[in-house]
Amino acid sequence: MNKKIAVLLKVIVSLGLITFLINQVDFKGIVNILKNVDITMIVYALILLTIQVFIATTRWQFVLKCQKIMLDYKNTLQILWSGLFFNQAMPSSVGGDVIRGYYLKKQGMTLGRATLGVLMDRLFGMVGLVFLVLASLPLLFELVDDSIARSGVLFIALGISLALLFIFFTDKLPGNFSHLKVIRGFYSLSQVGRRCIVDHYNGLIILVISILIHLISVISVMIMAAGLGINVEWSGFLLIIPLVTLMMVVPISIAGWGVREGVMVVGFGYLGVAPEAALALSILYGLLMLVVALPGGVVWTLKRNHTPN
């Protein structure tokens, strides 16, 4: 599919979902909730989300070490933040992962190693997320009575878990599968990823950092909710936010806009939160993530003479 058409479709999906949700709620109610927000709480959440970027940089350094790639912290941070800017702020066909891979290659790595370095970081981010989702499943049965919702979450969690296992053990498939181009593409990812896990020191640190990164998202949204006057037990956030993040991974919208709002309205609805409040919280969350990504635009601008066309 033409990249411009793909971007256009994502924009349509995001705008369509947000428009649909706004039409289902009292828009003035959303505005009033946002107008009465406690700015101090929002600043706290913004600080936490910014710290999250620095922690994510540390994880990426450990992931790169699994490939014997030694990149100093400053360069790693600049590359990651540039990628974050493109993921969050730029509705373009040049995604953040492409930017990260490009700048890794500019550090003297081969295209294959650069690509693997980015995919490995994505992979371990997903491992930490799925671990958190699976750990919070008991809360699903405690807080949600809807059997269809329960079944849907279990199906998604099981499906993603099996997909991750497949990726980590792709190279162990029978030899007659190795000629398939799609399978071969996962071989290096499988081998390096498994080696990284087997290295107890590196593997444990990466897993802990990955879980911590997602917990920061949970805590940040809790703080935002408090700033909006939304009262939900911590367990509700621990259940909903990882699921929201998991659904945002599906590349059907711009930076998860629309998808995030839909999942948060439905998810928090099960916990008794009004649609207007849940939608206001989701919009605020998206805006703060956008603000956090903006420094990456400054970094990219300084490097723009080296950016791919």
PLM feature segments, named:
Residues L119-L139:
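Hydrophobic alpha-helical transmembrane segments of ABC transporter permease domains
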Residues M1-W81, L139, L143-V249, A280-N309:
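Predominantly cytoplasmic-facing regulatory/coupling regions of multi-pass membrane proteins
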Residues I99-Y103, T115-V118, V130, I209, ...:
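Hydrophobic alpha-helical membrane segments of integral membrane proteins
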Residues K74-Q78, S92, G96-D97, Q107-L123, ...:
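Membrane-interface alpha-helices at helix entry/exit sites of multi-pass transporters
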Residues G83-S92, P242-W257, E261:
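Transmembrane alpha-helix interface/packing and boundary motifs in multi-pass membrane proteins
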Residues Q67-K68, I99, K106-M109, L228-G229, ...:
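Short helix-loop-helix connector
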Residues G96-K105, I254-G269, I283:
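Re-entrant/interfacial helical elements at transmembrane boundaries that shape
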